[in-house]
A protein has these predicted regions:
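Short beta-strand-centered segment that lines the nucleotide-binding/catalytic pocket of NTP-utilizing
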Residues: 116-132
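Short glycine-/polar-rich loops that comprise or flank the Walker A/P-loop
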Residues: 116-117, 207-212, 261-263
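Glycine-rich phosphate-binding P-loop
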Residues: 93-114
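Extreme N-terminal, non-catalytic leader segments
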Residues: 25, 30-92
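A glycine- and Lys/Arg-enriched "phosphate-lid" helix/loop adjacent to the NTP-binding pocket
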Residues: 210-253
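Conserved nucleotide-sensing/catalytic segment adjacent to the nucleotide-binding pocket
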Residues: 131-187
Length: 295
């Protein structure tokens, strides 16, 4: 049977089970299940026998399959995911968390689910500052976040937190500039790193973008410690484990900030569950923005 061409915005391409499965996995379905439903959508197309179908009609067909197989909640998430393409402002996801909680992995997986190409790690910004600014001029950027206490006065009550806050403020200037440019250029973006202070950019972002914030943590200490054993190359586990108490202290500090700012805290007990939680945050936010725009 000839392939059905999906028509959208004046162009067309044959129906792709892979693309449909990616769309369905974006709403939280396991990939195997997403492919199964994509095949069922293909079966519906074959039954129709149409040579061409509008993208909106294909989406309605997919919603019918979802409603039958997964229920109304899945249909709602699918509609929110589709609304991403119709946003009048860029999506900016801010993912905070201390060392070893899985921020980079989660950000990469989230970008794939959302079809985004720009992921910025705040530690890269710190490394750039470190390369251009001498230790004498700005010592705090020459330390890892959990060692930044060495750059502040010994008289301070909690040097670990004070040093981290100072470093986050310095790096935060670069983070703000990157997010500001993304808003101006309407470029979707994920920013991940410990220097994303929960709630710090809420006033600056305002209505310029569709912002989603989350703090990623690992509540179980043994599981958190085990994460460092998975690291290799230039980031040996021993260095992190020697400073594990400081890393946990910064996690507690960030958690307090997140709760005070109303930023969701996501426990990365397993990466799949954490990804699903963050995806729900994104889709819920997009759904609220789409509803307010429509009304």
């Amino acid at each position: 049977m000839p392939e059905t061409v999906v028509v959208s915005r004046g162009g067309g391409a044959p129906y792709s089970k892979g693309l449909m499965a990616q769309s369905l996995s974006a709403i939280g379905l396991p990939l195997e299940r997403a492919y199964e439903l994509a095949r069922r959508v293909e079966g519906r197309l074959d039954a129709l026998g149409a040579e061409r179908i509008e993208a909106a009609e294909l989406s309605a067909l997919a919603e019918d399959v979802l409603a039958l197989e997964e229920g109304d909640a899945a249909v709602s998430r699918f509609r929110h995911w589709r609304a991403l393409d119709r946003l009048d402002r860029p999506l900016v996801v801010l993912l905070a968390g201390t060392a070893g909680v899985g921020k980079s992995t989660l950000a990469t997986m989230l970008a794939h689910r959302l079809g985004l190409t720009r992921v910025i790690a705040t530690d890269v910004i710190r490394q750039v500052l470190r390369a251009f600014l001498s230790h004498d001029f700005m010592p705090v950027v020459h330390y890892s976040s959990f060692e930044a206490g060495a750059a502040v006065a010994e008289s301070l009550e909690d040097r670990d937190v004070a040093g981290f806050e100072l470093q986050a403020a310095r790096v935060g200037t670069g983070v703000s500039a990157i997010v500001d440019r993304a808003c101006r250029e309407r470029t979707p973006l994920i920013v991940e790193g410990i220097h994303v202070l929960p709630g710090a950019l809420q006033d600056a972002l305002g209505s310029r973008c569709v912002a989603v914030e989350a703090l990623l943590v690992v509540e179980d200490e043994d599981r958190h410690r085990a994460h460092f054993g998975l690291r290799g190359g230039e980031r040996p586990a021993a260095r992190y484990l020697e400073r594990f108490a400081e890393i946990r202290k910064l996690q507690d500090h960030l958690t307090e900030r997140a709760r005070a700012a109303g930023v969701p805290v996501v426990d990365n007990a397993t990466i799949d569950i954490a990804l699903a939680e963050v995806m729900d945050l994104v889709l819920s936010r997009v759904g609220r923005v789409s509803s307010s725009t429509a009304s």
